[in-house]
Amino acid sequence: MAVPTFVDRVTLHVSAGRGGNGVASVHREKFKPLGGPDGGNGGPGGSVTLRVDPDVTTLLDYHHSPKRRAEHGGHGAGAHRNGAHGADLVLPVPDGTVVSDPQGHLLADLVGPGTELVVAQGGRGGLGNAALASAKRKAPGFALLGEPGDELEIVLELKVVADIGLVGFPSAGKSSLIAAISRARPKIADYPFTTLVPNLGVVSAGDTTFTVADVPGLIEGASEGRGLGHDFLRHIERCAAIVHVVDTASIEPGRNPVDDLDVIENELTRYGGLEDRPRLVALNKVDVPDGRDIAGFVVDELRQRGLRVFEVSAASGEGLRELTFAMAGIVEAARAAKPAVEATRIVLRPPSVDGSDAFTVTATPDGWRVRGEKPERWVRQTDFSNDEAVGFLADRLNRLGVETRLAEMGAEEGDAVLIGDPENAVVFDFKPGVDAAAEILSRRGEDQRFDESRPAARRRRAIEEAMADRAEGETRADVARRLDRPAREDGGAYGPQSYEIGGRDDPDWAEEDLGE
């Protein structure tokens, strides 16, 4: 199978890097107790950027490797060390590349060297526990996870940036003409559809330098997909002028140059968007006797239509100087009317769901679905293996008003609550805490609903239970034995009791006091 050398349309799957995770760490140093949290933040993931490179003329590289991924961000570390930034992935594309989504919606038109489009943003790094510390939460035992980077499919379509476009039937001599007026060396042969890909040539006429595109041959029905023209008509959309190259030497029975020009014009009209471009007509191959005669028959009719007609020969060079200077005049006028293109940087940002702070709650057969930029981002940042992190999420959702909204809409304890899009939603059981308007007595970052399962709470509860069991099993004799004192014969208990000051029951009484 032949390997393509020119590709002007590809579907590219791009993935930005994931942000690094924050870390929960406590400062430890000799003679410095209670050093406090020192967990660093995760680094942001790398982004995917398309950049116009004048040295790139095809999308062939992305045809062979259609999946591209940027680097992930590094994780945070102790001692306030932040994770490394993921390296951005820069993909060079030809000048004139159009970027769209798989549904055909235009995202950007990249024109001008250095123009950039950030198609996929890297994920933000998670915060370490040092950044989460506050007056009420002095030593968080958790950190936030890094967010995933953007991942999407885009369609790259090349529309050659040329000043002049050559159009005509197959074997009209377009490739020979561009080879004669420039240093381009396209494939030339005496059979139709020799040219299978557009050829670009740089032409100089006086002080003006411009580019000419040789489009593969058009036939009737090209705008509907016949022949090769349908795939390459896009390459003349940016041209300042269109030159009809008409073969005057090898006319088939029933055909003439005027009819050929009308067929091509009809296809350009049906393709659309080219009606306002100036037209030039190059009657080619006049070096052949029959060609010169036929050109003489049709030149007046074409000029009566208001067309500028040139009798040329790509083989001998006849008429090429006049043709190229006419092209240069049109190009100069078009450039003067068009502002200069400066390199720009475009960033694609997916639209937020109902604004950055807003959220929606919808009843579904599966439960209650919550959508919103903040709730969905908070869920992605949460480490669900850490109870304190889950409590922090519950606190944030409560403060945002999610629990209050669910209660107002009739949600009951135990109902399923789904946060996020249907494909990646996280499911919770609705367990309402305190009212959102009431004061939250637990520390921020902790949740009373999870307090009993925390390790510190379990240890405290075990000690309390052991002390209670021991107290119940001790008798007064056990207490006396533990205190190394004999049990009182009267059965009285050791410990606080009433007594007369100076009497024998006074704990400060001594035998020497009797002598006084």
Swiss-Prot record:
Q: Where in the cell is it found?
A: Cytoplasm
Q: Which residues hold Mg(2+)?
A: S175, T195
Arranged from A to Z, the UniProt key words for this protein are: Cytoplasm, GTP-binding, Hydrolase, Magnesium, Metal-binding, Nucleotide-binding
Which spans are transmembrane here?
none
One Gene Ontology cellular component: cytoplasm
- Extract the InterPro entries matched here: G_OBG, GTP-bd, GTP-bd_Obg/CgtA, GTP-bd_prot_GTP1/OBG_C_sf, GTP1-OBG_CS, GTP1_OBG_dom, GTP1_OBG_dom_sf, OBG_GTPase
| Composition skew (Basic and acidic residues), residue ranges | 466-491
Q: Which residues form the Obg domain?
A: 4-161
Q: Where is this region: Disordered?
A: 466-516
Q: Where is the OCT domain?
A: 351-432
- Indicate yes or no for the key word Coiled coil: no
Query: Which cofactor(s) are needed, names only?
Result: Mg(2+)
Determine if Transcription regulation is one of this entry's keywords. no
**Start and end of every OBG-type G domain?**
162-332
Question: What does the entry give for GO biological process?
Answer: ribosome biogenesis
* Top EC category: hydrolase
EC numbers: 3.6.5.-
Q: Per its record, what are the GO molecular function terms?
A: GTP binding; GTPase activity; magnesium ion binding
Q: How does it assemble?
A: Monomer.
Task: List the HAMAP family.
Answer: GTPase_Obg (MF_01454)
Function as written in the Swiss-Prot or TrEMBL entry:
An essential GTPase which binds GTP, GDP and possibly (p)ppGpp with moderate affinity, with high nucleotide exchange rates and a fairly low GTP hydrolysis rate. Plays a role in control of the cell cycle, stress response, ribosome biogenesis and in those bacteria that undergo differentiation, in morphogenesis control.
Put simply, this protein is called GTPase Obg
Lineage, please? Bacteria, Bacillati, Actinomycetota, Actinomycetes, Propionibacteriales
